[in-house]
Curated annotation (Swiss-Prot):
It comes from the Eukaryota. Residues 105-263 form the FAS1 domain. It holds the Pfam family Fasciclin. This is FAS1 domain-containing protein KLLA0E16841g. Residues 1-20 form the signal peptide. GO terms for cellular component: vacuole. It is found in: Vacuole. It comes from Kluyveromyces lactis (strain ATCC 8585 / CBS 2359 / DSM 70799 / NBRC 1267 / NRRL Y-1140 / WM37).
Amino acid sequence: MRLNILSTLLLLGAIDKVVARRVLNLDSLDVSDSDSKNEKREPKRLPLDIEGIMAGHDEAMDKRDARRIGLNVDGLSDSELRLRKRDLRRPQFVLDITQGKVEERVNLDSRLAILQDISLFSEYGRDVTEVVAQWEDRSQELIVIAPTNDAISKLSMKPWQFPNNIDAMEQSNAEPKQIDDAIKENVAHFVKSHIVAHSDDFDLESDEIWLHSEADTSEKGDIVLKRQNNEYFVASASNMDFKLVKTVDVAANGVILIIDSSLITP
């Protein structure tokens, strides 16, 4: 079952209440402890039918949207009509939960380019062709977990230096092309380890959601999101060291979660 970005954030309550009211009544989501036994026994089942709720909500919104905006349905194909209505239902603002800033939404590529606190991560991302294509694609639904510049600077090795050990390759006189390819592979691995496109397989444990990054090959997932005391945290599944999400920015084709840590280290 696909858990899309909207369902993930609604389940965690990570979208600001103002936005949440425009999408779904969060009070209708029951993630109580009473479901924990069932979750352990059937880890790939949600305790409620998220997709059913969203489908019913979409149907109601479709009717209201047609009356309110006067769509020229005769001039649009079915796929174009769905995209138009979906865009209208999506959150229309970028939210900074720490400072309360509200800006008109843009695609991830444009938004990431102007967030100075994560400019290093953005630069690495722009070196990966397929990642740039995702950030520019308005049809995508991505979760980008972006380390701050300070977090990247504190790593013992630069993102392009691991997991392939570039220093060791240079000392062993590896061919220049081998080194260049290894550097590109390292950068792609670092960036993709911080991006979730969607999760076909996931486990829900209390208020924690397990997700697969684009670099993940495990069965369970390599990233964990959770809510605690009305704040949001993210961790690598390898160490479960949860870090506070400083800022949640909602873009047109995904969200950016900013943390003072890297999900992978040398």
